[in-house]
Amino acid sequence: TAQVDLAAAFSPAPNVTVYPLHSRTSFVTKNVYHTPDRERRTSTVDSVIEPYRTEEVPDIDAAIWHLAGLAAGDIPNEMIPFAARHAMVAIDVQTMLRWVENGGMVYHDWAEKKELLPYVRFLKTDAAEAEILTGLTDRAEAARQLYQWGAKEILITHNTEVLVYDGREIYTCPIRARNLSGR
């Protein structure tokens, strides 16, 4: 497994301090895309990380703590209220919906979403994940539902646009991607 010196990787960034949390294993996956827009894919997983633990997190003074894992279990549910005691919480919800089962990646709804979304200031989801969470295919309606459940600002990505809802207005911006590889 390749080792990356995170402090060195981020050293050119001004005012950025990196606090790496180590795992003996890495997340290793392969994605096969089924459509040119890359909205639907099949993922196989060879390895996952050890879950982050609240007792490992240093005392960090930051305005926002961004929680972004690659699969369920990377960031345990208890990390969300823990982070909210220190800063505003931003979360990429894929870490709560993507489960590794039999070497593959499958999506399941987040059972504790209604309990934990009130701790979340910024919620990032893609259109498919928003549908899993809410059962709604209309992205604006899904954003409104996620807001009602407690998230304060919702960002939903789709291959055609980015949608943001702040509890008052729906904002959209078309995506004109030059390249979707690596999405």
Features from the language model and the residues they span:
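Conserved N-terminal subdomain of the carbohydrate kinase-like
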Residues: 1-69, 73, 78-88
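Hydrophobic residues at beta-strand termini and immediately following loops
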Residues: 21, 172-173
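Residues that form or immediately flank small-molecule/cofactor binding pockets and catalytic motifs
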Residues: 23, 94, 159, 178
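Short, flexible active-site-adjacent loop segments at beta-strand->alpha-helix junctions, enriched
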Residues: 71, 93-95
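Structural detector of well-ordered beta-strand residues that form the stable sheet scaffold
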Residues: 89-90, 155
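Conserved phosphate/ATP/ADP-binding segment of small-molecule kinases
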Residues: 95, 99-172
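Short glycine/threonine-rich catalytic loop with a Thr-x-Gly-x-Asp
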Residues: 176-183
